[in-house]
């Protein structure tokens, strides 16, 4: 699937050739001026004088694409590029448009315990073995706030948070299948 391509950052040769051709075509299109278009179309300029002039830019589209692909493991693609917190509705991932803005620097107490979770998260992001984590304690001790703050803190490094309700636990295997090929790293928060 598409996620595999993003994760591997390689394409089969036939698709790579098609991609190169499309990027070259789009590169030409980006540099096309209205005057060049009118000349090629052999249309008298006065007939299309109402068309606005547009500016072109010196953009190296293949290089921009390669740069974006090199960052996909941190920035994501599609909805994962725009959002970093998700919930599950009817078996589908849905972005949380206004996630809790909690920051680690705003959380008092439990630094020692929180540091263990942060170290585990760093291991996950580095592609090293990471553990499942169970946070427990009295209500109001910052368990949920810590998870949300970690998600906010590490979103620029490719971390995404998926909030799963208790009555949705049966959907976790399907979620894992959907997320497995994604180059980002995910915390499932129950």
Regions inferred by a protein language model and the residue ranges of each:
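Short, small-residue-biased leader/transition segments that mark boundaries at the very start
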Residues: 2-6
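Phosphate/adenylate-binding glycine loop and adjacent helical scaffold
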Residues: 7-50
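Interdomain "pre-motor" coupling segment immediately N-terminal to P-loop NTPase/helicase cores
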Residues: 38-95
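Dynamic helix-loop-helix/coil hinge segments at AAA+ ATPase domain boundaries and subdomain interfaces
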Residues: 95-115
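Phosphate-binding P-loop
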Residues: 96-98, 122-130
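Pre-Walker A adenine-sensing motif
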Residues: 112-126
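Walker A/P-loop
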Residues: 132-162
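AAA+/P-loop NTPase substrate/partner-engagement loops
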Residues: 152-185
């Amino acid at each position: 699937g598409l996620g595999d391509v993003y994760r591997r950052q390689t394409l089969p040769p036939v698709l790579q050739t098609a991609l190169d051709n499309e990027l070259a075509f789009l590169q030409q299109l980006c540099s096309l001026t209205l005057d060049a278009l009118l000349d090629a179309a052999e249309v008298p300029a006065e007939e299309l004088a109402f068309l606005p002039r547009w500016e072109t830019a010196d953009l190296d589209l293949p290089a921009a694409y390669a740069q974006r692909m090199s960052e996909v493991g941190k920035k994501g693609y599609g909805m994962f590029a725009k959002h970093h917190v998700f919930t599950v509705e009817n078996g589908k991932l849905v972005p949380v448009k206004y996630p809790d803005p909690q920051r680690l620097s705003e959380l008092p107490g439990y630094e020692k315990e929180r540091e263990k979770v942060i170290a585990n998260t760093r291991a996950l992001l580095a592609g090293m073995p990471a553990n499942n984590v169970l946070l427990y304690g009295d209500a109001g001790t910052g368990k949920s706030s810590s998870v949300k703050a970690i998600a906010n803190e590490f979103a620029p490094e490719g971390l995404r948070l998926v909030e799963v309700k208790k009555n949705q636990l049966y959907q976790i295997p399907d979620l894992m299948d959907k997320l497995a090929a994604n180059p980002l790293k995910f915390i499932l928060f129950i």
